[in-house]
From Swiss-Prot:
InterPro entries: Put_antitoxin. This is Putative antitoxin VapB21. The keyword Cell wall biogenesis/degradation does not apply. The keyword Transmembrane does not apply.
Length: 73
């Protein structure tokens, strides 16, 4: 079943630029949404190349964000 949606000119141009030959706009939207979803395992080991200073900075920044969001760390 088809649905009609309204999009801005900018959104249309962006979708059109992503559209491949023979692909419908529905296909483009589905492909883009699926490709933007990441599996948590894609990030496994990603911090392995960080040095101690970078890790400490990361955790300091996270703590500041948690405090700003009023979340207990």
């Amino acid at each position: 079943m088809a649905k009609t949606i309204t999009i801005s000119e900018e959104a249309y141009r962006l979708l059109l630029s992503e559209k491949r030959e023979g692909e419908s706009f529905s296909d483009v939207i589905i492909r883009l949404v699926k490709s933007s979803r990441k599996n948590i395992m894609d990030y496994a080991g990603i911090w392995g190349d960080m040095n101690d200073e970078e890790v400490n900075k990361l955790f300091e920044d996270l703590k500041k964000m948690w405090e700003r969001w009023n979340v207990n760390a």
